[in-house]
């Protein structure tokens, strides 16, 4: 798939976030050595698994590296997030990553696992001796280790004004604006988005135009409000994104659909917006 580890850019113009534009081959470090040594000599039916994890510290801004950690899968939960938590708690407290709900709801633990974007809490650890490589979301500025800067992503989401807009307020202030079951069903496949950024950071068009192309996530939410029967700014919303870069950088590669942990298809929603632009 096109959103693997090749050609990743994890640098930034800011000196605080400065990183190299390539990954360094994994090498052993002394951090957590005691716990790793204990695991590697676990004997008695231990099922050892090596995790290669991207490390970069802004307080020591050299080249990033992949660091090896070995854990016993028999003493670990089944998900990649379980392994990360075990490593942080028992081997290396300096390892930094985002996580919260552990249920695929918050989207915090989005990262690149063995070349594919996904949520660590929903990705099962593959059995076998092959190493599992964990890196930050592709083509995002790295803050530290697996934590990326989501500022631009959230600003793009904010730019599509993701809230109900009315020209005619409800007759009774505070009264709910109703819609039919049929109109409500039109929002399926869009409202479930958790803004994890797996789709946008898997998109080659977004890699090369992150400042101008809104990306799959923001455009999916744009269509969510364009399709909402209660919203009265459909024309204005369409005009706001009728732009060569904001909308039409999408070339229907559909990496976004393959990467989405919720099974959504942003490419389909973007196509719907393009069709409305033509018919409008």
Curated annotation (Swiss-Prot):
Tissue specificity annotation: Ubiquitous. Preferentially expressed in flowers, inflorescences and root tips.
Domain 4Fe-4S ferredoxin-type: from-to ranges: 183-213
Pathway stated in the Swiss-Prot or TrEMBL entry: Carbohydrate metabolism; tricarboxylic acid cycle; fumarate from succinate (eukaryal route): step 1/1
Keyword DNA-binding: no
Pfam families for the chain: Fer2_3 (PF13085), Fer4_17 (PF13534)
Residues that hold [2Fe-2S] cluster according to the record: 101, 106, 121
Enzyme Commission code: 1.3.5.1
Cofactor: record remark: Binds 1 [2Fe-2S] cluster.
Binding site for a ubiquinone: 208
Signal peptide segment: none
Superkingdom: Eukaryota
UniProt GO BP: mitochondrial electron transport, succinate to ubiquinone; tricarboxylic acid cycle
Any one Gene Ontology molecular-function term assigned to this protein's record: electron transfer activity
Catalysis performed (reactions): a quinone + succinate = fumarate + a quinol
Residue stretch of the organelle transit peptide: 1-28
Classification via PANTHER family: SUCCINATE DEHYDROGENASE [UBIQUINONE] IRON-SULFUR SUBUNIT, MITOCHONDRIAL, SUCCINATE DEHYDROGENASE IRON-SULFUR PROTEIN
Free-text function comment from the UniProt entry: Iron-sulfur protein (IP) subunit of succinate dehydrogenase (SDH) that is involved in complex II of the mitochondrial electron transport chain and is responsible for transferring electrons from succinate to ubiquinone (coenzyme Q).
Protein's name according to its UniProt entry: Succinate dehydrogenase [ubiquinone] iron-sulfur subunit 2, mitochondrial
Organism the protein comes from: Arabidopsis thaliana (Mouse-ear cress)
Lineage, broadest ranks: Eukaryota, Viridiplantae, Streptophyta, Embryophyta, Tracheophyta
Gene: SDH2-2
């Amino acid at each position: 798939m096109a959103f693997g580890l090749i050609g990743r850019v994890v640098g930034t113009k800011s000196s605080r976030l400065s990183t190299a534009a390539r990954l360094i081959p994994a090498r052993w470090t002394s951090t957590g050595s005691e716990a790793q040594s204990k695991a590697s000599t676990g004997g008695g039916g231990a099922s050892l698994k090596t995790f290669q994890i991207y490390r970069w510290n802004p307080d020591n801004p050299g080249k990033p590296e992949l660091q090896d950690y070995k854990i016993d899968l028999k003493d670990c939960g089944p998900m990649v997030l379980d392994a990360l938590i075990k490593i942080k708690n028992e081997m290396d407290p300096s390892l930094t990553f985002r996580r919260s709900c552990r249920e695929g709801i918050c989207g915090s633990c989005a990262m690149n696992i063995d070349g594919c974007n996904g949520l660590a809490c929903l990705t099962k650890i593959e059995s076998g001796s092959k190493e599992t490589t964990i890196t930050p979301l592709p083509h995002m500025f790295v803050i530290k280790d697996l934590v990326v800067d989501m500022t631009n992503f959230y600003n793009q989401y904010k730019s599509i004004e993701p809230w109900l807009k009315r020209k005619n307020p409800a007759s009774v202030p505070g009264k709910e604006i109703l819609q039919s079951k049929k109109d409500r069903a039109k929002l399926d496949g869009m409202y479930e988005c958790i803004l994890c950024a797996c789709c946008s950071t898997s998109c080659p068009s977004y890699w090369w135009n992150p400042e101008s192309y809104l990306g799959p996530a923001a455009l999916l939410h744009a269509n969510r409000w364009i399709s909402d029967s209660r919203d009265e700014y459909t024309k204005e919303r369409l005009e706001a994104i009728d732009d060569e870069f904001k909308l039409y950088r999408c070339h229907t590669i559909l990496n976004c659909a393959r990467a989405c942990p919720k099974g959504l298809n942003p490419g389909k929603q973007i196509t719907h917006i393009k069709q409305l632009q033509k018919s409008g």
